[in-house]
Amino acid sequence: MIWFFDKDGEKLRYEISHNRSSGHYKVVITHPDGSESVEEVDEPTELIQRSVELMNSLRGDGWRVA
């Protein structure tokens, strides 16, 4: 799943992927400067909880879903 966020004309990409062989979920946030923040979790419930935290943090910083 991919979401795009916008803030003052800058774009941020938020991606969730699932590795079927390992079972891990990965959250990758690509910042406007091209740098990435990567987190991995094992369980779907962890993924949901962490995604809510990350998205709320982005919204709190002024990012809006594009």
Task: Please tell me what each predicted stretch does.
Residues 63-66:
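Short, charged, intrinsically disordered terminal tails
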Residues 32-46:
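A short, exposed loop/beta-hairpin motif centered on an aromatic-Gly-Thr core
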Residues 17, 30, 52:
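Surface loops and adjacent helix of pleckstrin homology
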Residues 42-61:
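A short, charged, amphipathic alpha-helix used as a generic interaction element across diverse proteins
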Residues 1-25:
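Short N-terminal "domain-start" leader segments
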Residues 25-27, 31:
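Positively charged, aromatic-enriched nucleic acid-contacting surfaces
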Residues 12, 23, 40-41, 51:
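Hydrophobic alpha-helical segments and their boundary regions
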